[in-house]
Design a protein with these regions (language model features):
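Functionally critical transmembrane alpha-helices in membrane proteins and complexes, commonly lining
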Residues: 18-76, 93-95, 301-306
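Structural signal for the C-terminal ends of transmembrane alpha-helices
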Residues: 72-79, 105-111, 178-187, 233-242, ...
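Interfacial loop-to-helix transition and helix-capping segments at the boundaries
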Residues: 20-22, 49-61, 155-168, 208-228, ...
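Alpha-helical transmembrane segments of multi-pass integral membrane proteins
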Residues: 254-346
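Solvent-exposed interhelical
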Residues: 170-199, 236-247, 318
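Juxtamembrane transmembrane-helix termini
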Residues: 2, 7-9, 60-90, 95-120, ...
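Membrane-interface helix-loop-helix regions
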Residues: 97-170, 276
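C-terminal "closing" transmembrane helix and its immediate cytosolic amphipathic cap
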Residues: 1-14, 77, 106, 262, ...
Length: 395
């Protein structure tokens, strides 16, 4: 395909088409990959799929973060700080809170009756439904069970072991919100590139850096995930010079494979920009059904898959083999996921876009596709980071 006139300033390739791509499909694949990954521990099966130093779910996390890094940076650089934060909160929090309520009010009672024969004592148990919802409202998961359920399952005491990662996703949103305040970051790609390299260095030297945070788990997890997110951000700030082309895409994916193979401890994070560029290229030629292009249910798949899998395990479906367990869980998870998208996520985002139209005060890094409406990014943004490994233990 030839270049359009808007591609004249690019050193290589063509501008990324923010409207005609399969990023929704790719994110849906990542969400389902997390469901598949969780099938092993939730069924009590050992030796879940892993390669290059991480699990299948862990690599799905990486994919989510790099795509999110690209799209969220676009959102930040094309919106005022206030509108940006409103968009991010609207995209993440309502569906998150409703998921907490659904688990506490629908899934947990079923689990309690299954374990005790009735609902007697359910509302007064050690971890009440209200406590579960209220304790986790701030995105930081601190309570995983409801009234001691789920019980009598291979992975007991955890209704939703995926939601913990949303906290770290939102931390990345706040980091981009902060660095976007500086005019130099908007005008030149180099500051954000340097910030990405510093995040990689922190990940490489985690053993030396961690003691200064007293081996804080949240700090270590953020340091591990941030390079993936910033890798996507780096690809965004260089898009006015480096377009999408098959040759650098193949080289990027090869470099990512080499880094992760030879340096499994930190090669994935160091490959953040390579992975992001490769995924953007794939999204331009991978065919996607129109229904998926227009409807993004990957967030719903992510937040509801784990409780659906736990509910199935309560009734012994995990004992019929991994294939049946995975397929049934995937089909059933689409029900709450689609409902969440149609009834909650899409209406809220449409309402937010109608009310928030304030542009960023400082022009973003100029590029041949700088005229793409900011809403295009938000229509593709899913603040999801389906978790990888290890699964969180109940507090």
């Amino acid at each position: 395909m030839g270049k359009s006139p808007a591609d004249g300033g690019l050193w290589v390739g063509k501008s990324f088409d923010s409207r005609n791509n399969s990023l929704n499909l790719i994110r849906l694949i990542f969400a389902l990959a997390v469901l598949v990954h969780h099938a092993w521990p939730l069924s009590g099966t050992e030796n879940s799929p892993a390669f290059a130093g991480d699990t299948l779910g862990g690599w799905a996390v990486a994919g989510f973060f790099v795509i999110s890094g690209y799209l969220i940076t676009h959102s930040r650089f094309t919106h005022s700080l206030g509108d940006y934060l409103v968009h991010r909160v609207a995209r993440i929090v309502p569906a998150f809170v409703i998921c907490l309520i659904v688990v506490a009010g629908m899934f947990a009672p079923v689990g309690y009756v299954k374990a005790n024969g009735s609902l007697d004592g359910f509302l007064g148990a050690a971890t009440t439904p209200f406590n579960y919802v209220f304790s986790n409202l701030g995105l930081r998961m601190s309570v995983y069970d409801v009234a001691g359920t789920p019980a009598a399952v291979p992975y007991a005491g955890v209704w939703n072991g995926s939601l913990w990662s949303i906290y770290f996703e939102f931390c990345c949103y706040l980091i981009v919100a902060f660095i976007g305040l500086f005019a130099l970051v908007r005008k030149s790609p180099w500051p954000l590139t340097i910030f990405f390299l510093l995040s990689v260095a922190a990940n490489v030297f985690m053993v030396r850096v961690s003691p200064y945070a007293q081996a804080n788990y949240e700090f270590e997890m953020l340091v591990h995930l941030l390079p993936f997110f910033l890798g996507g951000a780096v690809v965004y700030v260089w898009k006015h010079r480096i377009g999408i082309h098959w040759l650098p895409a193949i080289l990027s994916l090869a470099a990512a494979a080499a880094l992760t193979a030879f340096f499994p401890a930190w090669g994935g994070g160091a490959s953040g920009a390579f992975i992001a560029y490769g995924l953007l290229w794939i999204s331009l030629w991978l065919p996607s059904p129109r229904l998926i292009k227009k409807n993004d249910v990957s967030y719903g798949i992510y937040i509801y898959a784990f409780p659906v899998q736990q509910l199935l395990a309560l009734y012994g479906l995990h004992e019929h083999g991994l294939t049946a367990y995975i397929c049934i869980a995937a089909v059933l998870t689409f029900i709450p996921a689609v409902a969440s998208w149609i009834l909650l996520e899409r209406p809220i985002m449409r309402a937010v876009r109608r009310t928030g139209k304030t542009p960023a005060t400082v022009p973003a890094v100029a590029g041949p596709d700088a005229g793409v409406p900011a809403q295009a990014a938000d229509s593709n943004v899913v603040g999801v980071t389906p978790d990888g490994s290890p699964l969180p233990a109940p507090n």
